[in-house]
A protein has these predicted regions:
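Extended recognition/assembly regions associated with phosphoester-bond processing machinery
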Residues: 2-327
């Protein structure tokens, strides 16, 4: 668990938590957040964390029946986890939570909300691809991982998932990338992917990464590590932050996007994306990060500001994209 420190004064900011692979460990994640909330209230007197973002392998498993059968995972590794407690109402998620899908999901559940929707009170799935607002932050994301042989196929899978469909259902598709690329003129604050963007390791401490993960070396050398569609979206959308998971390690990078184009950026500062990948939930692992993110003041004013204005809302421009590309 890592924190970005005390908040800066004079700016409208939101305190958020970012999680790598959740693997069904919701109780442990929420407990870690509450512990950090308590510590920061005592130290800084600031309000609590407003939002939890999960970067895939969320495992919204409701039962040990159909949901178990739809997970691409050896049977000996299947665990019910704690999500079912939040689904049944036994527990309530203590803060708004948004997530994307990974490659180990209860696909039978996520298929029901594949365009985005609530999987439990206060827990929102962004869908195969999606864009929403939350309290002055525009958040976009794309679920799944890249596999070349499925990229240009349609989404033909439907429950009950059998055979290859158990895996292909979570593979990234060209249609989702095309739809998201139509939002390139909009300003993205946060973008989520389970798979890392291809080539992102070149913009961080790649040598340190390869010391810790020696088996990455060949894939990095041959350009096979990461998702080419995510790399394309990183270049097109240029979000302020990009969060990922999947590879079970922490890695940070700052990706430049070329010189500024006046008058859009009169300060002369080069536009960059701050990339962060996080680990899975295990003791002494870097699975959770807390940070302050500056929000759009005009959007905060539109939603009423304060805690009351911090709720999920549709992005009208994304809805227009979906309408224009639906057939």
């Amino acid at each position: 668990v890592h924190c970005s420190g005390a908040r800066k004064k004079g700016r409208e900011e939101m305190w958020i938590a970012v999680q790598g692979c959740a693997h069904g460990e919701l109780e442990a994640i929420y407990d870690a957040i509450e512990e950090t909330n308590k510590r920061h209230r005592e130290q800084f007197g600031q309000e609590g964390i407003a939002l939890l973002i999960c970067c895939g392998d969320f495992q919204s498993i409701r039962n040990a029946g159909a949901d178990f059968e739809s997970i691409s995972c050896p049977r000996k590794y299947r665990q019910l986890g704690s999500f079912h407690k939040y689904y049944s109402g036994e527990k309530l998620a203590p803060l708004p939570t948004i997530f994307i899908g990974g490659n180990h999901e209860a696909s039978s559940h996520l298929f029901e909300v594949r365009h985005g929707g609530w999987v439990a009170p206060n827990i929102y799935f962004l869908g195969h691809a999606g864009v929403v607002w939350f309290g002055g932050l525009r958040i976009g994301g794309m679920s799944g991982i890249y596999k070349r042989f499925d990229y240009h196929t349609g989404r033909y899978e439907a429950p009950p998932f059998q055979g290859d469909a158990v895996r292909s259902v979570y593979h990234q598709r060209y249609l989702d990338v095309f739809r998201l690329s139509l939002m390139a003129k909009e300003k993205f604050d946060v973008f989520l992917s389970h798979d890392w963007p291809k080539g992102v390791t070149a913009y961080g401490d790649e040598a340190d990464l390869l010391r810790k993960k020696k088996h990455f070396r060949d894939d990095v050398r041959t350009g096979q590590l990461g998702s080419p569609p995510c790399e394309e979206l990183l270049r097109r959308l240029q979000p302020r932050y990009w969060f990922s998971a999947h590879l079970h390690c922490k890695f940070a990078a700052i990706v430049p996007h070329g010189p500024p184009v006046p008058p859009e950026n009169p300060t002369g500062e080069q536009k960059v994306t701050k990339f962060l990948a996080l680990d899975k939930v295990l003791p002494n692992r870097h699975f959770l990060q807390f940070l302050d993110v500056e929000v759009h003041e005009e959007e905060v004013k539109r939603t009423g500001g304060g805690v009351e204005g911090r709720h999920f809302s549709y992005d009208p421009k994304w809805l227009a994209v979906l309408k224009a590309t639906h057939s």
